[in-house]
C-alpha cells in the first residue's frame, strides 16, 4: 500500500512539472475547447458595420469600449471626425439594446433613417430644427434614404422583409415616424398597450433640466436612456476642456458652452453651461407632485457618458405595498396638498447625497482620482487687473513641489528657482545613459503660472510661521509693522502692489492693532467643487400655497358631508376630484347629489352602474310581481328602505333561524334517477349553447350543463362497455366492470367495489340507470341481465348536486340573489384559512371547502383549544352542501379556495345559503377550475366571478424571501414575506429516472410530483413507505397546504405544459414550503431555470422583492429570390476524427460507454421489476448455449450496442417498457360522441370536398387483383391451404424482440439500460385476410387526402418529401410546430380505437369484418414462446399489426385536427407518431397539452422551432424552396454500429446510408442545417467539417471499409 501511494504522488508531481504528456494534452485540449466556446459566443453578438476610416489605435479603442457588438471595420469612407461619427452608430445601438424589442420608443432629436434601416417601426423621432445645422442634417437623412432606395432599384432588388413595415409606415404616415417639434411639444401618440421608452443621443443638452421630467411624464415614459459628451475639466474655472479620444473640445464663456471638433471648419454646437451641469449633478428630476425621474449613470465609453432616467412613484416611499381606495385617512389627503410642495423642496435639497460619497465621485469621474484643483493668477500689464483661473494637478506633484521649496533659504526662494525645480521634475531626465520619463504628466503651458502660485503660497506660509514664532518674544513695534517689514524685505520694490493685493483679496486683514493672515487653500477636491457648482445653479424660490389651501378647504367640506355614508372608507377620492375638475363643478354640489344616490333615496334600479347591474335593470320583470306586492305589508319601521332589495315575496326575519323557504315546492330526490332511461340523461351535443339572463345566471346554467355533461359521458361509456363485453375475464382488474346477473359473476372485474350507481341492461335490451346496494362485494340486483360500473361512478355526487340545483329553479331559471360578494385574492401563505377562523362566527356563519381533507383540517384547527366550535354543520364540503341542503340561513358565507370552483357553482353556493355577505378566498394565479369534460364549452368570460368588492393580501407568512422574489413577477403590487429564511430553493438535474431509489437517493420532507404517472412510479419504487408524510401527492392535490421541507420530482423527460414559467402548477409547487425546497428533474426545464435565476439574485435584491427582466430580440433578414435549390458540391474532405469530434460535442460522454457486457451484467445481477399480471415459465430463464456470432468492430466510437440474444429477462424488460404501465391521463370523456366529433373534424380538415361523401366498398374484384399483383406466391398458397371453416383466434398475438437496440441521440445511454423494441403480430392467416382489406382502405384514404397541403408519409421517397415542402414561402412569417408523443403505442385506448374504426367505416369497411377486427383489438393475449411469457393487454397499438403504421398516422392527424384549426395551417405532414405543422406566426392556439392529456391520453411535447425535424430529417426551407437533410448525428451514430457480419453486409449497409443521405452532397445550405441542429442540441457547433467527412467516406467503397475492423475471424 505504501508503494502504491508513493507511485501516485510521483505521478502528480510529474503532471505538475509538465512531464506527463497525457495531462499536458488534456490541458491543451481544455484550452482549445474554451477558446472555441468563447469565439462561438462572440460570433452570436449583434453585428455593427463601421465604415469610417480610423487608425489602428482607434479600432482597438472602439472594440474595447463596446464588447457587446461584433464590429466589422471596413475603412471605406473618409470623413471629418470619423471616430465620433462611427461611434454614434454604436452608441445608438447600445441605447436601443436596453429597450425591449417592439416597445413604443421616442428618439429625442433622433435620426429616423437609422431606425428605418433597422426596421424599427415602433420608434418615433422628435427632430426639431433649432438651427441651420439641424435643417441641413434632416435633409441629408432624407437623401440617404433616397440613395438607398435608388441602389435597390438599380440592382432590381426589393426591400428586405424586416424593413418593409417601417418603410410602409413612413410612406403612409410620415408624421408617425418623425416630427419637427421639440420633445416637450410633440403631440404624437402611438395609442398602443405596453410600456413607453425614450432615448436621447447627444440631445438632452437642449432640453431645460427643469422641464425634462414633466416632458417624460407627458409621454408616460417608463425609462429614458441618454448619452452625452462631458469632461471633468468643465467643473473648473477654465475656458476649454478637450476630449482627446474623439478629437473634440468644449469651450466655456460665461453660461455659453460651445462644442466643436478639432481640425474642422463648421458651426459650433452651443448649450447652456448651467443646464449641462444640472444633468450631470442632479440625481432626480421632478415630473409632478407624485412622480420623479431618478437618474443613474450606466457607464462611460470614449468620452461619452451613458445614463438612464427611471420613472419612480413617490407614493411608494416608506410603504411596502401600494394600496388605493381602502384607507379612510385619504379623506384628509386633500387638506395636506401643501405638504406635497414641502416634500418636493426637501427632496430637492437632498439630491446631492451621491456626491458626498468620495468613492462614488471617483467612479463616475475617473479622471479626478488623486487630483486637486489649484488656482492660477494672470495679471494684465495694460489694465493692471488680475484674472483667476483653475487647473487640475496631481496631488502628489503639488505636495512634492511645496515640500521641496519650503527648504530654500530666503535668498534662494525666488520665482526662477521655483520654476526651475518644477520644470526639472516635469521633464525627462537621463540616468546612466537611459532616458526616464517623468512620473507626473503636467501640461507645460501652465508650469509658469503654477510656479507663481507655489511661490506665493510658500511666502505667505513663511510669514505666518514667523508671526507665530515671534508671539513668544517681546518687540517694541506692533505686530502689524513687523509683518509688513518682513514682507517688504522679501519682495523688495514690489511691496506696495503686493500689500494692496493682499489686503483687497482678503488674505491679510488689519483691524486696529490686530493682524489676521489667511493662507490660500492649496487645493479643493473635485467633490467639493461639484457640490459648489450644484448649489450655485439650483436655487429654490418660495412657493405661494394660498390657492392649494383654499382648494383643500373646499374638498374637506365636501368629504365631511360624504363621511355619513356607509363604508365611506372605500370612496375613491381621486376619481371624485377628477370629476369635479373635468365637469367644473363645485365639490359641495357633487357631494349633495351623491349622498341621496348612495342612500338609495332616488329609487334607481341599481346601486353601481356595472355591466351586471345594467343587465339586471334591463331584464324582464318577474311574472309574479303583482302577487309579491299584494303579499307585502309595508310599515314605516320596515328593516329595508326600499322594495327592490327584497329577494322574494316573503318578509325577511330579523334574526337567524333554522327555516328556509325554497322557491320550488317539489324537491326532486336522487332516487328519481333509479331505473331512468339512459337516453333521457345522455346529452345529444356538446356544442356551445346560448344562455340568456345576467352573467351570473348564465354561469349557473353553464354549471348545471357541466354536471349533466359529466353524467352523460359516464353513462355513455358504461353503455359502450355493456355492448363490447362478450366473454368472461374475472382475472383482470380494470377501470370498468360488468356483472352478469344471471350467472352471478363478474364478466369484467373492476378495480374497486361498492359503486353508488351504474347502468343496467334489462332483459328486453333497454339500458337504465340504477342506484346500487352491495353485499359481500356483489351488487344486489333486480330482474336485470347485466350491470356496468366504472371508476367514474363510485359516488353519485354529480347526480346529487344536479338534482338539488334542479329543485331550486324558479320557472326553469336559477334564482339569483344579490348579497355582497367579496373576493379575497391572496398570495400563497398569506393566512387565508387563518383569517377565516379569526373572522367566522360559528353560530351564524358557514364555511365551505372543496375537499374532505381541507374540511378536517379546518375543524381540527378551530377546535384545538378544546372548545368545540366547528362541527359538520358549519364546516362542510361543497359537494356535501349541494347534495344535502339544510333549511337554515346564514349571516356570512366563507368559501375557501373558491377560485378552484366553477363560477356557476360559487353563485349557487351564495344563493342557496341565503347569506347576507359572502367571502370568497382564493388565489387568481394558482391552479384554477379545470374543465375535465372533453369538448364541453366553458367560455372565457364565464371564468370570472361577479364581485362586489375585491381585496388583496400580499403578505406571505409562509414563503421564504427567494420564493417571494419569484412571486413578485406573478402578482400585481409588491409581495412581502415574514419568513426569516432568505434562500430555500435548490435543484438537481439527475442523469435519468433510474437513479431514484429510497436508499441511495432519499428525498427530504413532503414528496410531490406534477403528474399522476410520476406519482405512481415513485410509489412503485417504495418512496411512500419511507416518507415521513406517508402519501405522495401531485401539485394539484396539495394546493393550500403547508410543509417545512418539500421535494418535487419529475421523472418524465418529455416537455410538459404543466412545467412552464407561467404555469400555475409551478407557482403552487414553489410555495408549499417554509424552510427548504428541492427539485429533482431528469431534464433541464423552466423550473430549473427559475432556480438558476433565483440563485443569481443578491441578498440586497431579495430584501427589495423586485424583478427586473429584459427582452432580447434578434432581427431576421429574409431574401427575395425564388427558384430551385442552389447546388454547391460538397467537398470530400476530412477524417474519421472529425466525425468523432462532432459526435462527442453533441452527445458528450456517449463514446466512452463500455456496454459490451451490459447484457451479461443484466442477467447476473439482482433486478427489481414492476410487472403486471402475467404468466412466466422459468424453465426458459436458462438460455441454450449457442456459438457467439462475430461482428465487425467499428473504428468510430458511439453508444451503439451489439445485438442481444432473446431470453426470459431480456424479453420481459422489453415487454415492461413497451406494453406495461400504460399512462392513464384521460378525463371524463363520452367516447362515442367525442369520437364522432373528432372524425367529422378529421374529414373536414384533410379530405377533399369532392371526395368527402359516399362509401366505396373496398372488397371488389379490382381491389383483389391489385392486391394479388403485389403478393408473393407463398402468401397466395397460404390462402389456398386455409379451410375457411372458422377464423383463427383474432385476439391472440405472438411476441418477440428486435435483436438490435435502438440508438438514442441523448445522454440517457450513459445511465439507462436500453430496452429492446418488441414486435407483436398476428398469425399469417389473419394477415392474409386483413392485409389486402386495409391496404385497399389505405389507398382510398390517401387518394382523398388534400396532398397539396397535407402529407401522409406512407410510400413516399425523400425526394417527394422535399418536393412537398418546396413551395413554402419564406417571406410569410410562420413558425414550425412539432408534436412528439412518448409511449405512443401503449397510450392508445378505447377512444383511439373508436376514432380509427369510424374512419374505416366512412371508407366502407364491412360490418362483420369490422366487428371481428374490434374484438381482436379490445382484450388481447400475448404469448412469447422464446421467453415463456404470457400476458393480457387491453387495447394498445400492436407493433406488428397490419394497421400499425397507417393507424398511428391517422390517429396523430386526428389528434391535431381536434385541437388545432387546420384551415389556418400552411403545411402539415404526419408519419406514425411524428408530425410537423407550419402555421402563421402569432396564430392563437388552445392548450394542446391539456387536450392531449384529457382527451387523447398522450404525454405530449410541443416544440416551436424555426426549422422542421420530421422522421429523422431536417427540413430546411429557404428563399428558393426547401431541402431535406438526413440527421447527420443519427448518420454518424450508425457508423459506429456493431452488428455488421461480413463485407457484403457492410456494402449493403453503405448503399442504404448513401440512399438516405444523398442530399448531403449539396453543401449550399449547411449554414441553415447547423442552425437547425443547434435548436435540437444545445451544445452543437458548426459541423460542416463533419458533413464533408461523411460524404467522403460514404462515396468511396474502399475508404468506407476502413471504418470497420473485420479482425481475424471475419469471413467474406
From Swiss-Prot:
Region feature Methyltransferase, mapped onto this chain: 50-452
GO molecular function annotations of the record: ATP binding; ATP hydrolysis activity; mRNA methyltransferase activity; RNA binding; RNA helicase activity; RNA-directed RNA polymerase activity
Chain segments carrying region Helicase: 822-1080
Catalyses which reaction(s): RNA(n) + a ribonucleoside 5'-triphosphate = RNA(n+1) + diphosphate; ATP + H2O = ADP + phosphate + H(+)
EC number: 2.1.1.-, 2.7.7.-, 2.7.7.48, 3.6.4.13
Domain Alphavirus-like MT: 72-280
GO biological process, alphabetically ordered: DNA-templated transcription; mRNA modification; RNA processing; symbiont-mediated suppression of host innate immune response; viral RNA genome replication
Positions of the (+)RNA virus helicase ATP-binding domain: 794-953
All residue ranges annotated as the RdRp catalytic domain in the record: 1374-1487
InterPro entries referenced in this protein's UniProt entry, alphabetically: (+)RNA_virus_helicase_core_dom, Alphavirus-like_MT_dom, DNA/RNA_pol_sf, P-loop_NTPase, RNA-dep_RNA_pol_alsuvir, RNA-dir_pol_PSvirus, ToMV_Hel_N, Virgaviridae_RdRp
Keywords, sorted A to Z: ATP-binding, Helicase, Host-virus interaction, Hydrolase, Inhibition of host innate immune response by virus, Nucleotide-binding, Nucleotidyltransferase, RNA suppression of termination, RNA-directed RNA polymerase, Suppressor of RNA silencing, Transferase, Viral immunoevasion, Viral RNA replication
Annotated ranges, domain (+)RNA virus helicase C-terminal: 954-1112
Quaternary structure, from the entry: Heterodimer of a large and a small subunit.
Additional record remark: This protein is translated as a fusion protein by episodic readthrough of a termination codon. When readthrough of the terminator codon TGA occurs between the codons for Leu-1112 and Gln-1114, this results in the addition of the RdRp region to the replicase.
Family, per entry: Belongs to the ssRNA positive-strand viruses RNA-directed RNA polymerase family.
UniProt protein name: Replicase large subunit
Amino acid at each position: 500500500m505504501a508503494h502504491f501511494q508513493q507511485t501516485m504522488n510521483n505521478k502528480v508531481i510529474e503532471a505538475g512539472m509538465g512531464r506527463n504528456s497525457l495531462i499536458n494534452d488534456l490541458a491543451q485540449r481544455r484550452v482549445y475547447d474554451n477558446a472555441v466556446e468563447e469565439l462561438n459566443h462572440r460570433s452570436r453578438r449583434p453585428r455593427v458595420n463601421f465604415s469610417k476610416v480610423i487608425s489602428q489605435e482607434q479600432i482597438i479603442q472602439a472594440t474595447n469600449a463596446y464588447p457587446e457588438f461584433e464590429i466589422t471595420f471596413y475603412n471605406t469612407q473618409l470623413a471629418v471626425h470619423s471616430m465620433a461619427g462611427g461611434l454614434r452608430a454604436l452608441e445608438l445601438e447600445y441605447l436601443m439594446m436596453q429597450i425591449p424589442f417592439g416597445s413604443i420608443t421616442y428618439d429625442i432629436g433622433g435620426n429616423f433613417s437609422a431606425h428605418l434601416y433597422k426596421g424599427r417601426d415602433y420608434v418615433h423621432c422628435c427632430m426639431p430644427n433649432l438651427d441651420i445645422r439641424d435643417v441641413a442634417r434632416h435633409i441629408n437623412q432624407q437623401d440617404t434614404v433616397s440613395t438607398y432606395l435608388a441602389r435597390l432599384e438599380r440592382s432590381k432588388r426589393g426591400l428586405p422583409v424586416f424593413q418593409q413595415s417601417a418603410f410602409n409606415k413612413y410612406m403612409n404616415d410620415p408624421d408617425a415616424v418623425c416630427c419637427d417639434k421639440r420633445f416637450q411639444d410633440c403631440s404624437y401618440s402611438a395609442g398602443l398597450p405596453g410600456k413607453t421608452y425614450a432615448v436621447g443621443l447627444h440631445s438632452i443638452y437642449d432640453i431645460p433640466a427643469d422641464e425634462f421630467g414633466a416632458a417624460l411624464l407627458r409621454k408616460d415614459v417608463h425609462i429614458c436612456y441618454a448619452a452625452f459628451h462631458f469632461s471633468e475639466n468643465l467643473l473648473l474655472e477654465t475656458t476649454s476642456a478637450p476630449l482627446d479620444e474623439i478629437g473634440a473640445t468644449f469651450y466655456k464663456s460665461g453660461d455659453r458652452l460651445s462644442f466643436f471638433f478639432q481640425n474642422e471648419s463648421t458651426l459650433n454646437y452651443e448649450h447652456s453651461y448651467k443646464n449641462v451641469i444640472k444633468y450631470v449633478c442632479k440625481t432626480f428630476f421632478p415630473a409632478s407632485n407624485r412622480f420623479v425621474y431618478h437618474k443613474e449613470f450606466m457607464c462611460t465609453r470614449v468620452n461619452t457618458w451613458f445614463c438612464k432616467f427611471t420613472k419612480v412613484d413617490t407614493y411608494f416611499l416608506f410603504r411596502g405595498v401600494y394600496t388605493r381606495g381602502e384607507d379612510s385617512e385619504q379623506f384628509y389627503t386633500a387638506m395636506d396638498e401643501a405638504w406635497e410642495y414641502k416634500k418636493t423642496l426637501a427632496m430637492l435639497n437632498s439630491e446631492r447625497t451621491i456626491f458626498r460619497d468620495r468613492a462614488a465621485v471617483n467612479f463616475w469621474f475617473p479622471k479626478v482620482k488623486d487630483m486637486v484643483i489649484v488656482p492660477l493668477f494672470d495679471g494684465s500689464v495694460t489694465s493692471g487687473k488680475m484674472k483667476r483661473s483653475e487647473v487640475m494637478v496631481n496631488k502628489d506633484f503639488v505636495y512634492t513641489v511645496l515640500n521641496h521649496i519650503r527648504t530654500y533659504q530666503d535668498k534662494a526662494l525666488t520665482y526662477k528657482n521655483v520654476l526651475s525645480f518644477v520644470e526639472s521634475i516635469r521633464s525627462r531626465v537621463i540616468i546612466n545613459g537611459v532616458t526616464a520619463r517623468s512620473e507626473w504628466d503636467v501640461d507645460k503651458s501652465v508650469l509658469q503660472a503654477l510656479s507663481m502660485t507655489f511661490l506665493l503660497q510658500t511666502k505667505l506660509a513663511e510669514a505666518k510661521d514667523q508671526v507665530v514664532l515671534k508671539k513668544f518674544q517681546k518687540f517694541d513695534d506692533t505686530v502689524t509693522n513687523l509683518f509688513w517689514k518682513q514682507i517688504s524685505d522679501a519682495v523688495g520694490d514690489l511691496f506696495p502692489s503686493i500689500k494692496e493685493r493682499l489686503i483687497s483679496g482678503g488674505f491679510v486683514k488689519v483691524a486696529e492693532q490686530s493682524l489676521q493672515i489667511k493662507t490660500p487653500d492649496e487645493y479643493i477636491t473635485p467633490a467639493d467643487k461639484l457640490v459648489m457648482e450644484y448649489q450655485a445653479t439650483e436655487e429654490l424660490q418660495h412657493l405661494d400655497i394660498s390657492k392649494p389651501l383654499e382648494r383643500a378647504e373646499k374638498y374637506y367640506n365636501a368629504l365631511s358631508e360624504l363621511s355619513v355614508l356607509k363604508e365611506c372608507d372605500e370612496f375613491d377620492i381621486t376619481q371624485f376630484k377628477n370629476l369635479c375638475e373635468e365637469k367644473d363643478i363645485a365639490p359641495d354640489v357633487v357631494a349633495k347629489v351623491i349622498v341621496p344616490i348612495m342612500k338609495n333615496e332616488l329609487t334607481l334600479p341599481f346601486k353601481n352602474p356595472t355591466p351586471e347591474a345594467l343587465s339586471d335593470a334591463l331584464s324582464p320583470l318577474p311574472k309574479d310581481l303583482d302577487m309579491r306586492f299584494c303579499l307585502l305589508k309595508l310599515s314605516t319601521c320596515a328593516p329595508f328602505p326600499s322594495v327592490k332589495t327584497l329577494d322574494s315575496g316573503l318578509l325577511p326575519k330579523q334574526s337567524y333561524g333554522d327555516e328556509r323557504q325554497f322557491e320550488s315546492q317539489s324537491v326532486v330526490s336522487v332516487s328519481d334517477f333509479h331505473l331512468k332511461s339512459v337516453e333521457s340523461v345522455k346529452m345529444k351535443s356538446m356544442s356551445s349553447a346560448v344562455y340568456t339572463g345576467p352573467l351570473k345566471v348564465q354561469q349557473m346554467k353553464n354549471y348545471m350543463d357541466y354536471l349533466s355533461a359529466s353524467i352523460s359521458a359516464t353513462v355513455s361509456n358504461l353503455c359502450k362497455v355493456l355492448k363490447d363485453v362478450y366473454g368472461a375475464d374475472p382475472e383482470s382488474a380494470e377501470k370498468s366492470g360488468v356483472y352478469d346477473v344471471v350467472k352471478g359473476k363478474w364478466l369484467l372485474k373492476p378495480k374497486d367495489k361498492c359503486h353508488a350507481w351504474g347502468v343496467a341492461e334489462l332483459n328486453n335490451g333497454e339500458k337504465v340507470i340504477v342506484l346500487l346496494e352491495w353485499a359481500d362485494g356483489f351488487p344486489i340486483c333486480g330482474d336485470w341481465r347485466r350491470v356496468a360500473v366504472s371508476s367514474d361512478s363510485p359516488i353519485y355526487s354529480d347526480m346529487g348536486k344536479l338534482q338539488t340545483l334542479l329543485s331550486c329553479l324558479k320557472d326553469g331559471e336559477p334564482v339569483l340573489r344579490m348579497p355582497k360578494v367579496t373576493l379575497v385574492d391572496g398570495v400563497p401563505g398569506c393566512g387565508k384559512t387563518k383569517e377565516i377562523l379569526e373572522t367566522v362566527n360559528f353560530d351564524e356563519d358557514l364555511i365551505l371547502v372543496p375537499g374532505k381533507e381541507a374540511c378536517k383540517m379546518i375543524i381540527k384547527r378551530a377546535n384545538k383549544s378544546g372548545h368545540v366550535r366547528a362541527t359538520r354543520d358549519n364546516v362542510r364540503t361543497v359537494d356535501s352542501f349541494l347534495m344535502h341542503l339544510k333549511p337554515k340561513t346564514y349571516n356570512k358565507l366563507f368559501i375557501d379556495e373558491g377560485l378552484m370552483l366553477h363560477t356557476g357553482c360559487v353563485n349557487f353556493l351564495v344563493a342557496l345559503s341565503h347569506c347576507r355577505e359572502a367571502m370568497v378566498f382564493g388565489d387568481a394565479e394558482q391552479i384554477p377550475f379545470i374543465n375535465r369534460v372533453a369538448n364541453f364549452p366553458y367560455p372565457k368570460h364565464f371564468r370570472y366571478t361577479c364581485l362586489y368588492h375585491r381585496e388583496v393580501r400580499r403578505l406571505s407568512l409562509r414563503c421564504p424571501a427567494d420564493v417571494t422574489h419569484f412571486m413578485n413577477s406573478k402578482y400585481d403590487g409588491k409581495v412581502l414575506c415574514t419568513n426569516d429564511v432568505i434562500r430555500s430553493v435548490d435543484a438537481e438535474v439527475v442523469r435519468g429516472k433510474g437513479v431514484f431509489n429510497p436508499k441511495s437517493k432519499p428525498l427530504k420532507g413532503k414528496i410531490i410530483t406534477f403528474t399522476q404517472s410520476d406519482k405512481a412510479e415513485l410509489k412503485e419504487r417504495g418512496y411512500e413507505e419511507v416518507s415521513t408524510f406517508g402519501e405522495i401527492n401531485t401539485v394539484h392535490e396539495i394546493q393550500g397546504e403547508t410543509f417545512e421541507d418539500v421535494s418535487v420530482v419529475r421523472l418524465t423527460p418529455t416537455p410538459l405544459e404543466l412545467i412552464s414559467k407561467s404555469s400555475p402548477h409551478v407557482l403552487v409547487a414553489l410555495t408549499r414550503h417554509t424552510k427548504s425546497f428541492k427539485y429533482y428533474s431528469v431534464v433541464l426545464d423552466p423550473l430549473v431555470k427559475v432556480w438558476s435565476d433565483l440563485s443569481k439574485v443578491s441578498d440586497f435584491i431579495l430584501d427589495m422583492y423586485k424583478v427586473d427582466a429584459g427582452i432580447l430580440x434578434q432581427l431576421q433578414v429574409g431574401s427575395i429570390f425564388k427558384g430551385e435549390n442552389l447546388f454547391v458540391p460538397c467537398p470530400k474532405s476530412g477524417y474519421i476524427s472529425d466525425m468523432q469530434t462532432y459526435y462527442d460535442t453533441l452527445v458528450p460522454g456517449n463514446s466512452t460507454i463500455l456496454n459490451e457486457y451490459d447484457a451479461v451484467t443484466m442477467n447476473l445481477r439482482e433486478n427489481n421489476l414492476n410487472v403486471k399480471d402475467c404468466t412466466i415459465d422459468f424453465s426458459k430463464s436458462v438460455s441454450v448455449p449457442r456459438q457467439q456470432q462475430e461482428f465487425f468492430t467499428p473504428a468510430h466510437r458511439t453508444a451503439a450496442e451489439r445485438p442481444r440474444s432473446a431470453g426470459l429477462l431480456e424479453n420481459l424488460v422489453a415487454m415492461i417498457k413497451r406494453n406495461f404501465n400504460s399512462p392513464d391521463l384521460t378525463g371524463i370523456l363520452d367516447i362515442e360522441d367525442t369520437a364522432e366529433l373528432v372524425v367529422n373534424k378529421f374529414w373536414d380538415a384533410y379530405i377533399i370536398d369532392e371526395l368527402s361523401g359516399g362509401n366505396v366498398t373496398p372488397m371488389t374484384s379490382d381491389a383483389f387483383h391489385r392486391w394479388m399483383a403485389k403478393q408473393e406466391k407463398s402468401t397466395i398458397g397460404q390462402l389456398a391451404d386455409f379451410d375457411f371453416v372458422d377464423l383463427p383466434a383474432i385476439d391472440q398475438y405472438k411476441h418477440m424482440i428486435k435483436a438490435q437496440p435502438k440508438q438514442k441521440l441523448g445522454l440517457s445511454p450513459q445511465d439507462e439500460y436500453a430496452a429492446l423494441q418488441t414486435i407483436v403480430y398476428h398469425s399469417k392467416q389473419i394477415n392474409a385476410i386483413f392485409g389486402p382489406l386495409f391496404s385497399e382502405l389505405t389507398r382510398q384514404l390517401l387518394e382523398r387526402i388534400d396532398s397539396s397541403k397535407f402529407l401522409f408519409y406512407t410510400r413516399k421517397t425523400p425526394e417527394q418529401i422535399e418536393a412537398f415542402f418546396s413551395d413554402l414561402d419564406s417571406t410569410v412569417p410562420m413558425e414550425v410546430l412539432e408534436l412528439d408523443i412518448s409511449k405512443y403505442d401503449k397510450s392508445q385506448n378505447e377512444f383511439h380505437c373508436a376514432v380509427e374504426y369510424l374512419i374505416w367505416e366512412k371508407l366502407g369497411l364491412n360490418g362483420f369484418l369490422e366487428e371481428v377486427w374490434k374484438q381482436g383489438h379490445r382484450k388481447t393475449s400475448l404469448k412469447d414462446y422464446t421467453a415463456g411469457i404470457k400476458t393480457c393487454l387491453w387495447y394498445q397499438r400492436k407493433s406488428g399489426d397490419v394497421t400499425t403504421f397507417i393507424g398511428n398516422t391517422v390517429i396523430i392527424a386526428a389528434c391535431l385536427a381536434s385541437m388545432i384549426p387546420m384551415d389556418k395551417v400552411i403545411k402539415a405532414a404526419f408519419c406514425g407518431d411524428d408530425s410537423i405543422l407550419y402555421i402563421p406566426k402569432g396564430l392563437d392556439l388552445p392548450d394542446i397539452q391539456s387536450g392531449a392529456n384529457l382527451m387523447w391520453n398522450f404525454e405530449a411535447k410541443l416544440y416551436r422551432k424555426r426549422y422542421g425535424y420530421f422522421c429523422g430529417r431536417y427540413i430546411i426551407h429557404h428563399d428558393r424552396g426547401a431541402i431535406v437533410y438526413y440527421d447527420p448525428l443519427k448518420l454518424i451514430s450508425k457508423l459506429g454500429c456493431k452488428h455488421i457480419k461480413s463485407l457484403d453486409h457492410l456494402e449493403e449497409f453503405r448503399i442504404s446510408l448513401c440512399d438516405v443521405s444523398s442530399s448531403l452532397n449539396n453543401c449550399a445550405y449547411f449554414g441553415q442545417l447547423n442552425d437547425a441542429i443547434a435548436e435540437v442540441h444545445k451544445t452543437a457547433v458548426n459541423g460542416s467539417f463533419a458533413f464533408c467527412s461523411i460524404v467522403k467516406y460514404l462515396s468511396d467503397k474502399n475508404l468506407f471499409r476502413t471504418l470497420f475492423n473485420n479482425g481475424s475471424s471475419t469471413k467474406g
